[in-house]
Swiss-Prot record:
Ranges occupied by Sel1-like repeats: 38-73, 107-138, 139-172, 173-208, 240-275, 276-311, 343-378, 379-414, 415-450
Matches recorded under SMART domains: SEL1
Matches recorded under Gene3D superfamilies: Tetratricopeptide repeat domain
Annotated keywords: Repeat
The protein's name in its UniProt record: Uncharacterized protein NMB1327
Note: Present in outer membrane vesicle formulations which are used as vaccines in human.
């Protein structure tokens, strides 16, 4: 049999020319892979599956990819697995495909395996692959290892910060985003607004959606035009914080010309996600008839919803309204407002101690304060308290106690609580695994304003495929 390397090298020589005869290239590569050349079928598959190529033939390209994989070509095997992942194959199908490639040292397979293990809550094995990947200076491995340091028991915010910096230096947008948040809130480093802006802008300019709104919030006083641009970009992705910010901007006529119609549009969009300030602004629009007919009953309805969602300013509106128009309700509303204000103060202190915001983390103190706020009905405190029990932060993990607090928060439509319940029921932590119930909870998280809807929608599709 002829040496298969000869036609393969001839094909590569043809491809190196600005203009080449693809029919001849195809003949040479076919001759090479038929004689057993391990890279020839993969090279032909690349050109047949190139969407920009005039010779694209996906069906033939897939056939070549399969032949290359059968001949042991690592990237052919990787691409077949990745195509299955894009088509929605569940993690339990994909993990056995990526694992041998990762063990052979393929960096891309190590990253995919690492993320799939993490998403499937196989945290210990995911951590080992993150360490391996980070050791090889892979930005994804550095990022996930930073996440483990940040959320570990105990947390190591300084190491997380250093790993985020290494990952961001290689351009990973999510690492820039996390650095921006750390500099903004003083976690693992001193507060540095200029650095926060630099990193959030680097992430946003790469199209990383979660960075849009925090960047806009920081630069609004000094660069209002750019801030409005990022708020608008985030609003196009249905970020309720961005919608609420734009509603206020259009209503006040600050940084943009006053526009009651657009204020109403953005307030309604934020309110649809149960955003407390979006609901409060909608109440103001109805109360004062800003671009619409005044409607005090509707205003009270939105203020009540906003107050239930946590808006202290909405409570103040209800207190003022009841003092003037419903004195019999004044005492009850005032007591509720005082209770909410106390719960919010407890929650803010607990959050700082939990996540080490401008202080060293203290889990025992955070747990005590979260519990007090949770017992006062603060939904975010209930969710964070559940997370502490779930991950065993400051105590032995207790899935039943975690689920109890997640369910209390979910009863108040807290989107993160719905997400956590979805994970509990999918993984069977403290309960029998129930993928259908997990999918229902995940859909509720999407419906109730979870910050990264597209990520959850992709996850929901994977879970539904596994049912």
């Amino acid at each position: 049999m002829n040496n298969p390397d000869l036609p393969y090298r001839q094909a590569l020589e043809c491809l190196s020319q600005k203009q080449y005869n693809f029919t001849e290239v195809r003949r040479l590569l076919t001759e090479a892979f038929s004689a057993g050349h391990p890279a020839a079928a993969f090279e032909l598959a690349k050109h047949l599956m190139d969407a920009d190529s005039p010779y694209q033939d996906r069906e033939q390209g897939m056939e070549m990819l399969r032949i290359a994989a059968e001949q042991g070509h690592p990237y052919a095997r990787y691409n077949l697995a990745y195509i299955q992942e894009l088509e929605g194959a569940p993690p339990e199908t994909l993990i056995p495909l990526y694992r041998p490639l990762a063990e052979e040292g393929l960096p891309e397979a190590q990253v995919r395996l690492m993320y799939l293990l993490y998403a499937s809550r196989h945290f210990e094995e995911a951590l080992e692959w993150a360490k391996t990947s980070a050791k090889n200076n892979n930005p994804h491995g550095q990022y996930l290892l930073a996440q483990y340091c940040r959320y570990g028991t105990p947390p190591d915010f300084e190491t997380a910060h250093l790993l985020y910096r290494k990952s961001a230096a290689q351009g990973l947008p999510e690492a820039h985003w996390q650095l921006g948040l750390q500099y903004r809130f003083g976690q693992g480093t001193k507060v540095d607004t200029a650095q926060a802006v630099n990193h959030l802008r680097a992430a946003a300019q790469q199209g990383y959606i979660p960075a849009y709104t925090p960047l806009a919030e920081l630069i609004l006083p000094t660069a209002p035009d750019e801030a409005v641009h990022w708020f608008q970009q985030a609003a196009q992705e249905n970020d309720p914080d961005a919608h609420a910010a734009l509603a206020d901007i259009y209503l006040q006529g600050k940084h943009l010309e006053r526009n009651h119609k657009l204020a109403l549009h953005h307030a309604e969009a934020a309110a649809a996600e149960r955003h407390p300030e979006g609901l409060r602004i909608l109440g103001d629009i109805c109360r004062y008839g800003l671009g619409i007919a005044p409607d005090t009953e509707k205003a009270r309805h939105y203020y009540r919803q906003a107050a239930e969602a946590g808006s202290l300013s909405a409570y103040q509106k209800l207190i003022s309204d009841s003092a003037l128009n419903h004195p019999d309700q004044y005492g009850g509303i005032k007591d509720s407002a005082i209770r909410r204000q106390r719960a919010e103060r407890l929650y803010q202190k607990a959050q700082a101690l939990h996540y080490g915001l401008q202080c060293a983390p203290e889990y025992a103190a955070a747990l005590k304060l979260y519990t007090e706020a949770a017992e006062l009905g603060h939904s975010k405190a209930q969710t964070n308290l559940g997370s502490m029990y779930y991950f065993g932060q400051g105590m032995t993990a207790d899935y039943n106690e975690a689920r109890k607090w997640f369910e209390k928060a979910a009863a108040k439509k807290d989107s993160m609580a719905f997400y956590n319940l979805a994970c509990i029921h999918y993984s069977g932590h403290g309960v029998e695994p129930d993928k259908e119930k997990a999918c229902r909870y995940l859909q509720e998280a999407i419906n109730n304003g979870y910050g990264q809807k597209s990520v959850l929608q992709e996850l929901l599709q994977q879970w539904q495929n596994a049912v």
